[in-house]
């Protein structure tokens, strides 16, 4: 099963995925997890540290051990492992970054691609999927978590949109869904942006594309800045040519 998770910031989608991963690992030795990002160099400071924090948040640090070389977390109760990888190839058509991956026991219960939109090219996701599906258990899940890009023409909108059209589950969340769990200062900051900078708020916290590419400038006022062309015509005049000038930036 595929799960697409496009959401804004402060929605706990990363923590929720990690709690599910920990729960799966503790249930069965076959429930290995493959936790990935675009760049291998980002793993330690992001998903590896985050996963450890979630284990500690759940009070289960005594049930797990972890190592830095390779980046790996093992459940002492079952032996299930969480592997960490960067999936970007060296070029757009380089499909080899995850080619040699093999999990313990040749099984995977959960594959998570965090910040999926940061992958350089969707070819790299396709290559990652081809490896993952070789080991994915019947109950296994492929999870694509990301904050929607500002640019509505980014490849992620089509790529993940097609997945949903083809049957993938879509989970969309905002900060309001975990309102009671957020620190009061975080809520105050969010509400400040909602009031003072609604465009930024929509992008950052609601996960909506708001950049100006393909959009009318927010300063545009139809009443002030459009005129009926026929106001400029003399009687019995007609349009012979229409020239349209566009500026983008």
Where are these predicted regions, by residue range?
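Conserved P-loop
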Residues: 2-72, 156-158, 173
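Residue-level preference for the first positions of well-ordered beta-strands
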Residues: 2-4, 32-34, 81-82, 110, ...
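Short beta-strand/turn micro-motifs composed of small residues
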Residues: 37, 113, 146
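Catalytic acidic motif of RecA-like/P-loop NTPases
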Residues: 41, 114-120
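Inter-Walker segment of RecA-like/P-loop motor cores
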Residues: 42-109, 209
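Hydrophobic residues in beta-strands of the RecA-like P-loop NTPase core, especially within AAA+ ATPase
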Residues: 108-114, 246
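ASCE P-loop NTPase helicase motor core
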Residues: 118-195
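ATPase catalytic-site recognition across NTP-hydrolyzing enzymes
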Residues: 179-246
């Amino acid at each position: 099963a595929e799960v697409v998770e496009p959401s804004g910031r402060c929605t706990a989608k990363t923590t929720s995925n990690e709690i599910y991963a920990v729960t799966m690992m503790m249930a069965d030795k076959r429930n290995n997890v493959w936790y990935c990002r675009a760049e291998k160099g980002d793993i330690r400071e992001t998903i590896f540290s985050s996963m450890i924090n979630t284990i500690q948040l759940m009070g289960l640090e005594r049930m797990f051990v972890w190592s830095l070389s390779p980046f790996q977390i093992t459940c002492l109760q079952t032996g299930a492992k969480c592997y960490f990888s960067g999936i970007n190839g060296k070029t757009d058509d380089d499909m080899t970054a995850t080619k040699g991956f093999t999990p313990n026991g040749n099984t995977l219960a959960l594959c998570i691609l965090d910040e999926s939109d940061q992958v350089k090219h969707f070819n790299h996701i396709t290559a990652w999927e081809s490896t993952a599906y070789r080991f994915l258990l019947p109950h296994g899940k492929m999870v694509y978590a990301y904050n929607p890009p500002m640019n509505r023409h980014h490849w992620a909108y089509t790529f993940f949109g097609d997945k949903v059209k083809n049957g993938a589950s879509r989970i969309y969340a905002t900060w309001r869904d975990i309102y009671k769990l957020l620190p009061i200062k975080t809520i105050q900051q969010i509400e400040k942006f909602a009031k003072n900078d609604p465009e930024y708020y929509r992008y950052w916290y609601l996960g909506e594309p708001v950049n100006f590419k393909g959009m009318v400038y927010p300063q545009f006022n139809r009443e002030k800045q459009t005129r009926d062309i026929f106001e400029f015509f003399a009687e019995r005049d007609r349009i012979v040519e229409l020239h349209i000038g566009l500026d983008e930036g």
